[in-house]
């Protein structure tokens, strides 16, 4: 059974939104991880870091995080025309804040510089990725 025009549009929008948001998020985060986060975390908790990183858990996080971002923020904004930056920043602050502030609270060698850097980065990265993914989707498939 062939898809209807509205069904095709739905899947095109969802696909472009997911792929563009994920690509932007992954590319920017990869750059930041290599240039800033890895040296920062190595300086403070190097003995705890896996080398090489475990790819499967990282992939699962990225796939689920982008899916959650689309579900909670980007898709509703696409459908309603609502702005996306503030809502996405809140999601980023909550997600990265949960990790960083909990780690700082319970781990002896967790440094405040790690908390601030990763918290701000996660907030900005999430907001920008959602905004850019939405802009690409609106520009290409409406």
Feature map (PLM): residue ranges:
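Short, Lys/Arg-enriched N-terminal segments with co-localized hydrophobic residues
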Residues: 1-11
């Amino acid at each position: 059974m062939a898809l209807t025009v509205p069904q095709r549009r739905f899947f095109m929008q969802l696909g472009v939104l997911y792929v563009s948001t994920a690509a932007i998020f992954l590319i920017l985060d990869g750059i930041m991880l290599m240039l800033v986060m890895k040296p920062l975390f190595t300086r403070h908790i190097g003995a705890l870091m896996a080398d090489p990183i475990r790819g499967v858990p990282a992939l699962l996080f990225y796939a689920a995080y982008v899916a959650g971002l689309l579900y909670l923020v980007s898709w509703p904004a696409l459908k309603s025309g609502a702005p996306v930056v503030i809502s996405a920043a809140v999601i980023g602050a909550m997600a990265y804040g949960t990790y960083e502030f909990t780690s700082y609270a319970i781990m002896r060698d967790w440094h405040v510089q790690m908390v601030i850097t990763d918290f701000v980065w996660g907030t900005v990265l999430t907001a920008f990725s959602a905004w850019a993914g939405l802009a690409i989707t609106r520009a290409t498939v409406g």
